[in-house]
């Protein structure tokens, strides 16, 4: 996303929120050595740092700026992102502060008529909602505070040059008062759409630029609107173009107006012009002031590859999508979730470079899925030709009275976890399963109680390989099954009856979602994707599936 007049104090003469800043991290001149360097302390870089800490891998995070992000960044955090953040220890704070929502509404026409509403969480009995709205600076702050004990973050440290060698990467890092050399075994570029690392390496970032301009106004107000996503086609208050409204914490609301392609960009962000648009949307009775105003266009791009020997790209540094669908930051957090456990195993000697190639395979596939959805959304929302405009109007016109047409109304296909069914790490089924969940999918949460107070399946998994074992009085005892598992795989026994040696599926929801019978066994990856499943525990097959899920089988003779 390309923004102009991004700062409110530049564009409109004032800013209403003080940005949290950090002093430059003291460093020693000379040469230093660390296993992993992460460039960028945004949500993706910070999530990687938190995950590496859990994995026992030392890392340093280099951040060229002096504090938290500001302005119109990510606000919509999807259920899968919340599940990842829960494992990393920050989701409770996100839920406490954020605005929970599951419902979206689509309006159209001169009367702003409601076309239809949709529930983004049709499958209930899960720990987290479909989305939580929370300003990006809060998410960053929660990660920074979680990492505060021996923090790996080096503030105001800029990468000036790099050289990739056979045994790692040499960086020249500029700090406010000095310059130093830093050697790492692995370099992760999580430094955003204008990635310094990508530029220094001269790597591609091919894609498409969209010409339409959009105005974001984050306004502070006490409004009577519900906590839901509200989207307008042909908005009467926005000259017949699209508009979007979202609630954020602190009585802040995100208002997004399509302006078109050929506009006076300087005039668009003048206070009187912004106020005219906001007032037309809200009506005359609601008082408001501005937290942030920005004008943006956006791009859909990705690198050809995300893994370049010992340099790995994640988040916006690797792929860039439009904001419609909230697929940017959420996709980046899934990058981090996919990468951290794989690189940790390579560093510990438990896997080889083939496992990192699977990060490239799986996350390029996910990026293409996000790019496709983002591009389709943008094309539908911003028709470029009379034919495209006619199609949009016809579909929108049918949607109110004809449910079949609603599937074709595209106001942003919202972020969902990417499945990895075709991944080389996934073992195909040998047995019949009726559940919608398939190998390669992210595990679907469900109630699961244990004596230690955990109440949900995903709370039991953590960032490790787990063998989920559904049992009853007639199946082998948990201790017997555990003794047959490969090293590094934890057993999670589940029973419909209350037992001291198993977690309790009291409602039966978990068993139903996994089409589990007594004996059903599932191997789950550290990023909580289902790697393989069987109708009975089979030690040789479990071992083979583990070798496949860690890419070891790819290099075995």
Name these PLM-found stretches:
Residues 96, 105, 144-145, 166-170, ...:
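Conserved FAD-binding catalytic core of PHBH/FMO-like flavoproteins
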Residues 53-73:
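Glycine-rich FAD pyrophosphate-binding loop
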Residues 2-35, 39, 54-55, 109-111, ...:
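Helical substrate-recognition/capping region of FAD-dependent monooxygenase/halogenase enzymes
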Residues 32-34, 177-186:
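Core beta-strand elements of the Rossmann-like FAD/NAD(P) dinucleotide-binding domain
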Residues 155-169:
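A conserved short coil-to-beta-strand element within the FAD-binding core of flavoproteins
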Residues 11-18, 249-251, 266-331, 351, ...:
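FAD/FMN-dependent oxidoreductases across multiple families
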Residues 70-146:
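Active-site-adjacent segment of FAD-dependent monooxygenases/related oxidoreductases
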Residues 45-46:
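N-terminal Rossmann-fold NAD(P) dinucleotide-binding loop
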């Amino acid at each position: 996303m390309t923004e102009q007049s991004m700062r409110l104090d530049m564009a409109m003469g004032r800013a209403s929120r003080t940005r949290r800043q950090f002093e430059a991290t003291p460093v020693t001149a000379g040469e230093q050595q660390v296993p992993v360097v992460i460039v960028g302390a945004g949500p993706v870089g910070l999530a990687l740092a938190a995950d590496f800490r859990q994995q026992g891998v030392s890392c340093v995070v280099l951040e060229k700026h002096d504090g938290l992000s500001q302005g119109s960044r990510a606000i919509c955090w999807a259920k899968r992102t919340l599940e990842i953040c829960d494992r990393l220890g920050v989701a409770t704070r996100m839920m406490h502060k954020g605005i929970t929502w599951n419902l979206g509404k689509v309006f159209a026409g001169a009367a702003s008529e409601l076309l239809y509403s949709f529930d983004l969480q049709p499958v209930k009995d899960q720990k987290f909602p479909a989305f939580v709205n929370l300003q990006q600076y809060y998410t960053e702050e929660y990660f920074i505070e979680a990492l505060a004990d021996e923090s790996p973050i080096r503030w105001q440290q800029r990468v000036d040059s790099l050289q990739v060698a056979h045994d790692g990467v040499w960086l020249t890092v500029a700090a406010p008062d000095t310059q130093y050399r830093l050697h790492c075994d692995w370099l992760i570029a999580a430094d955003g759409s204008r990635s310094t690392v990508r530029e220094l390496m001269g790597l591609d970032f091919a894609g498409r630029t969209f010409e339409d301009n959009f105005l974001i106004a984050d306004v502070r107000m006490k409004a009577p609107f519900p906590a839901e996503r509200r989207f307008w086609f042909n908005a009467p208050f926005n000259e017949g173009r699209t508009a979007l409204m979202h609630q954020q914490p602190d009585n802040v609301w995100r208002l997004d107006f399509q302006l078109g392609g050929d506009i006076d960009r300087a005039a668009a962000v003048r206070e009187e012009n912004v106020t005219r648009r906001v007032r037309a949307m809200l009506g005359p009775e609601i008082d408001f002031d501005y937290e942030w105003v920005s004008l943006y266009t956006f791009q859909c791009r990705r690198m050809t590859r995300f893994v370049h020997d010992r340099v790995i790209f994640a988040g916006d540094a690797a792929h860039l999508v439009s904001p419609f669908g909230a697929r940017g930051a959420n996709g980046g957090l899934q990058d981090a979730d996919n990468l951290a456990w794989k690189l940790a195993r390579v560093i510990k000697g438990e896997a080889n470079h083939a496992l990192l190639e699977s990060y490239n395979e799986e996350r390029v596939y996910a990026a293409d899925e996000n790019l496709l959805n983002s591009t389709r959304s943008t094309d539908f929302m911003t028709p470029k030709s009379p034919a495209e405009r006619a199609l949009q109007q016809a579909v929108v016109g049918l949607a109110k009275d004809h449910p079949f047409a609603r599937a074709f109304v595209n106001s942003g296909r919202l972020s969902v976890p990417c499945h990895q069914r075709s991944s080389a790490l996934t073992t195909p089924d040998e047995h019949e399963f009726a559940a919608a969940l398939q190998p390669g999918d992210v595990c679907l949460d469900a109630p699961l109680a244990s004596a230690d107070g955990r109440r949900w399946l995903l709370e039991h998994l953590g960032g490790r390989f787990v063998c989920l074992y559904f049992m009853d009085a007639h199946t082998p005892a948990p201790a017997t099954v555990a003794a047959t598992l490969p090293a590094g795989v934890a057993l999670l026994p589940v029973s419909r009856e209350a037992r001291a040696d198993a977690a309790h599926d009291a409602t039966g929801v978990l068993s139903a979602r996994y089409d589990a019978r007594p004996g059903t066994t599932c191997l789950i990856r550290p990023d909580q994707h289902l790697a393989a499943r069987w109708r009975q525990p089979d030690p040789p097959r479990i071992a083979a599936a583990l070798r496949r899920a860690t890419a070891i089988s790819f290099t075995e003779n």
